[in-house]
Amino acid sequence: MSEDTSLGSQALFSDAGGMKDFGSGVYMLQLFANVCMVDCGEGVVIFDAGLPTDGWRIVKELRAVSDLPVRYIIYGHGHADHAFGTKAVLEDAAERGHPRPVIVAHENLPKRFDRYQRMLPYHERINRIQFAIPEGIPAFPWDYIYPDETFSGEMTLRLGDITIELRHARGETDDHVWMWVPERGVACVSDF
């Protein structure tokens, strides 16, 4: 297990408040972008996977409250602070002998990742200026873990007795998704 420090200034993207327990197996890790975790009894759903630098922090905080396998990782949208901490979660699953989590996103997200890769030098330059990231430290993600499943309007997942409703809507991006967990009365909304 190694922590990825490849994206930006650690001070800028530091912990914004730690893990919050909302009861009923619902947790939120407050980082640069919030990460929602729902313990469904038979496994965990992670909504938004954070920055590359957040991955092992997500795993550490999750493992402090649950040893269950992560069954789904939902990308709220394709920005760097929402979809790039995935690698650590996948490595944790492999190390524990758990099945690989299924990654779910809106159908526009793969096109966003493709565009990011084509325009990487430009995004590097913009982020370097916007976030004061010094030369020699990557300022934009290089590793892309694409979703296994995509959807257009709505998608419903079941995990144990828990329903995970995913809905697309225009938010900050055209690939924006929000999640509703009716049995828990919880909405995870990414950057809406």
Spans of features found by a protein language model:
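Short, basic/low-complexity N-terminal boundary segments at the transition from targeting/disordered tails
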Residues: M1-K20, I129-F140
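Active-site metal-binding motif and surrounding structural segment of the metallo-beta-lactamase
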Residues: T53-A105, T150
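Metallo-beta-lactamase
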Residues: K111-H168
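Acidic/His-rich structured neighborhood in mature extracellular/periplasmic domains
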Residues: Y144-P147, L159-T163, E172-D174, V181-R184, ...
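Hydrophobic/aromatic beta-strand patches that form the interior of the parallel beta-sheet core
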Residues: Y27, I74, V104, E149, ...
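Short catalytic-loop micro-motif centered on adjacent basic/acidic residues
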Residues: V45-D48, Y72-Y75, L166
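Short, solvent-exposed loop/turn and secondary-structure capping segments
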Residues: G85-T86, D114-Q117, S190
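Conserved beta-strand hairpin/beta-sheet module of binuclear metal-dependent hydrolase folds
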Residues: A16-A64, W178-F192
